[in-house]
Amino acid sequence: MRLLVLTAIGLMSAIPHFAAGEARSEAIGNWAFYAGDAGGSRYSPLDQINKTNVVELKPAWELHTGDVSDGSDGRPKSEFETTPIVVAGTMFLSTPFNRVLAVDPETGKEKWSFDPKIDLREHYSEGLVNRGVTFWSDPGVTDGPCRQRIFLATIDARLFALDALTGHPCSDFGIGGQIDLKAGIANIKRGGEYEETSAPAVIDDLVIVGSSIADNDRVDSPDGAVRAFDAKTGKLRWSWHPIPENLAPTGAGNVWSTISVDAQRGMVFLPTGSASPDYHGFKRPGDNKWANSVVALSARTGELVWGFQLVHHDLWDYDTAAQPVLGVLRREGSETPVVIQGNKTGNLFVLNRETGKPVFGVEERPVPRSDTEGEDASPTQPFPLLPPPLAPLQLTTNNAWGINPEEREACRVKMEKLKSEGIFTAPSVQGTIAFPGNLGGMNWSSGAFDQSRQLFVTNINNLPMEVHLIPRDQYKPVEKAAQQGTLRAEVSPQHGTPYGMSREVLHSPLGLPCSPPPWGELIAIDLSKGSIRWRVPLGTTADMVKDPAHVIPGTPNLGGPIVTAGGLTFIASAMDNYLRAFDTETGQELWKGRLPAGGQAMPMTYLAGQNGKQFVVIAAGGHGKLGTKLGDSVIAYSLP
């Protein structure tokens, strides 16, 4: 098998501490972090499965977790977004109920399970979800319990340290193996508004977490602090505040997505969210640094190294949802360590990893101003000179879309009543088209970087949103209509501002988006040139419509891709229930495997068994908010 020779930098960031007897080849065959390596590349050096034989992939095993909720019994709907890890001969994964399972990676048989016993009936703003767990091995200990640990951050904001061999909580960590992450955080006023959804980051003897905070509830949202804890004891080592604490009442700016780590440079990279609330900023004047940014901190001290803001004074929920991807850019005969950062606007920023300076250049361009009383929108926003925007940046009545003339005309009439001056059109009482909407562009799925080919592959959404500011004296009837189901929109109060808000996909009477398809795409960017190599629709509406004649390519999507040395990109994500393999260099679809439920998760790949067989695994449990078929499956594929 051909294995890509990793650079020293890549190897240090990709492989955690292993016991003395573990072979380096075993480490390369692992998927040791949520995104494959600590730098978020989503790349595997395995090529046993490749372009010539991927068509032969078959299901190897299927595991049922039993953890699924359709919302009919009062519990939130489940969202199976986890990506397993494989390290130290075991697969570790989390479920929507936040349980942890240890599994034999060759057979799919369960070794142990751990239940943190979250309240399944709590109104969590993010639903029932957990994206993954993190492995850590103590380099100073050779034997004994909890030498190797699994860190789990739960939806009810607790951090657990578990013995990787048994699943038992590590008694020397926090209190009985857990930490209450709500402790020390200001302005938490109800259960379910301060949460954890992503896998923690680890570097040296630190475990680092951000938080997920409910959007649009009020001005004084909880503090979005990022904190590092001692991986052995659970003691707080440092905290960093994206929004300075003295800027009350503004909160949030939190890091709810995955943190990336550069072990060689001793740096961590944070994708920060929006300041509160998302759609009205009169109590948070200015750019609101360091919200809506990618930020580099010293891992040892938590001190700011550099920051780069992707959106000034956010009014669109354009938080930095994608994990920063670390790689090496080869261009014009030189190599540059970079951070590749996408965001919901559909723009892709490539920054020098050490300085935060744009590699291709960025310019501040004028954008529409706000006509809402008290709102001082930023007059400019940053746009990268390269690559070009991945998503369309404006929707007008001229390109209103419908599946038939009546549907198109209904969309056109609706759009005529809404403000649409291009991307960054400010929210208004009249109503505004936000395009791209708050689903992106790029979302938490991020993208995958094949460094040998210099190709960055990502999925995007091309969905318009209809956003309204609701004067305070008109808000209660709108909220009641939403609660009763007579209004389809998501409605939030934005307490502390003069306006509530509503948002929904800008749709036709049949419920289809008013923008032209594809509504979801898979795109490859050649970073050596800063240009788009190829783009293809992702998925079809075949599982959403009864008439095959009305199947449309390119659906909304959540999840993400991985890339391999075998020249393959694996991704599910779309609203049809398939895992697909694409040729990374051309975008040609080479294979697809039917899933029993929605695949709104990122796949992963690894070697297992005496002969080192390559498997590709994905969680197929659907997504309550996206509306795909729910289930509880984890499925592994391999060659016969």
Task: Put a short name on every predicted segment.
Residues E22-D70, T83-V86, L522-I523:
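Mature N-terminal segment immediately following signal peptide/propeptide cleavage
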Residues H17-I49, S378-E406, R412, T486-E490:
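N-terminal pre-domain segments of enzymes
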Residues N443-W444, T458, P516-E521, R533:
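Active-site neighborhoods of metal-dependent hydrolases
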Residues I433-P464, L469-P471:
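Segments forming glycine/polar-rich beta-alpha architectures that bind adenosine-containing cofactors
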